[in-house]
Amino acid sequence: MALLQISEPGMAPAPHQRRLAVGIDLGTTNSLVAAVRNSIPEALPDDAGRVLLPSVVRYLDKGGRRIGHAAKEEAAIDPRNTIVSVKRFMGRGKAEVEGAANAPYEFVDAPGMVQIRTVDGVKSPVEVSAEILATLRQRAEDTLGDDLVGAVITVPAYFDDAQRQATKDAARLAGLNVLRLLNEPTAAAIAYGLDNGAEGLYAVYDLGGGTFDLSILKLTKGVFEVLAAGGDSALGGDDFDHLLFEHVLAQAGLEVAALAPEDVRLLLDRVRGAKEALSAAPQARVDVKLSTGEKLAQTITRDTFAALVEPLVQRTLGPTRKALRDAQVSAADIKGVVLVGGATRMPVIRDAVAKYFGQPPLVNLDPDQVVALGAAIQADLLAGNRSGGDDWLLLDVIPLSLGVETMGGLVEKIIPRNSTIPVARAQEFTTFKDGQTAMAIHVVQGERELVSDCRSLARFELRGIPPMTAGAARIRVTYQVDADGLLSVFAREQHSGVEASVVVKPSYGLGDDDIARMLEDSFKTAEVDMRARALREAQVEAQRLVEATEAALVADGDLLDASERATVDALVASLRALAPGDDADAIDTATKALAEGTDEFAARRMDKSIKRALAGRKLDEI
């Protein structure tokens, strides 16, 4: 009889039965796809042997399009219909797109995510990204010889909910099943850690075309634990290009507004080429013939470029310091620094990293490929292609705290930043007024104490709360962040069981510097925030006590004589007058005075309630 072949759950029993899954690095400048083949992760090339696909899409009339290298080569002749660096637009509104005024595109004034008008119609960043992803999917299926079961797609660690959701939407549009959204620095650590069997504390310095991430990871016996993450969602190699572009224009006495769109794109391409050349040579030339016939020729030295971009280099060190502080480690504790992203090839970056951490960075893996390789390893695991040596665990984190608005515009943090995901946390709240039958749940993101200083993510209402006295209802609010970093919120009234929930999908994501600014502001203004919170709490308590006292006077004012009533009225009036002010101590003092001044009144009301409850009842009935 035939023998039954038994394999561990989740493990493919034979190599020919491996489920095909890939890792995709959807980058600002370039994108690529990788897969595990013969137990080794490798980037998959196109027919010409190129692994990098320029993240460029050119739209033609009658539904035609060019993607990748062909589109990049034609960008200068048709800049309005050739979309580059689309990742910068993902999950963002027009007002949040840095440099939108100088871009050659015709932006459509529409609510939500920014859209671009082309000869083939209006396109969203999700649609453009889907074209790139579909091209990579086709490359993978052609190379691997079968359909894919799914893909792990990498995103910057500092991408917010909207940007992550936009990425998933693009993948679905491209016909990809998303197994996981994986933070780019974490993917790099997986590739590096598994490749080298590394253990200890590592920093991943990820400077891509449009984003910067810095993550601190602890690698221990197959466990990849992200201790802290920092970054800037609007800082990348493109910004270095634009600084050099502006310098070249200034040296030539030109202004960008005076250039034709095709000249802007052509000059940007030449400037980018010069920047890349400076990584290997002490100087580089920028030679351009503009559409006007004017020739522009300049020599850029490495020292000139380094001085020019020094402010941008320093911008990367701010989040680096914060991440180290959050992880409660110092630069000296870091065993190695992994560089990710093509922009880290710049000597000025490598020198700055080496100086800050006191050691040369690790560059034995291609910074353009390392993220995709790590994603491929994770995809292979999630597809069920585990082998005996694949017992490793990934523990990632959320970059910013998630909270809920409470009475007085205060923020109650439910999940603090750098919490390991997936995670679910719950907290109980109650009603503020007697007979309250509904509660508005306002979900916010940020590190500040007041709602007005944080980013609003979503709002929903819990209705059907049974009428009770203030403080009697128990509403349990649960925040749940999945492995992709996406948030769902649930609210349930414990007595009645009524429920409400929302999957957080903001119309578009955080602004250019919102996330970094939120963290920076929280450190700079911590003392001010705490004072503001104390004032708001005092005001809320004062309002509650005034309303409760006035309600009691209406119901049982006859329990006080004229003199006592006058005293209580005076205390109420004093507190009502102070409550809107900004003197928390004075409000607290007046609140305490009213509370103490109504102690006797409260006791009489209690006696009256007890007598009413016992009236007409015999002793043996009690």
Swiss-Prot record:
PROSITE patterns linked to this entry: HSP70_1 (PS00297), HSP70_2 (PS00329), HSP70_3 (PS01036)
GO MF annotation list: ATP binding; ATP hydrolysis activity; ATP-dependent protein folding chaperone; unfolded protein binding
UniProtKB keywords: ATP-binding, Chaperone, Nucleotide-binding
Lineage top rank: taxon: Bacteria
Gene Ontology biological process: iron-sulfur cluster assembly
Residues making up the signal peptide according to the UniProt record: none
Pfam families for this protein: HSP70 (PF00012)
Family to which this protein belongs: Belongs to the heat shock protein 70 family.
Function per UniProt: Chaperone involved in the maturation of iron-sulfur cluster-containing proteins. Has a low intrinsic ATPase activity which is markedly stimulated by HscB.
Protein name: Chaperone protein HscA homolog
Source organism of the structure: Burkholderia mallei (strain ATCC 23344)
The organism's taxonomic lineage, starting at the top: Bacteria, Pseudomonadati, Pseudomonadota, Betaproteobacteria, Burkholderiales
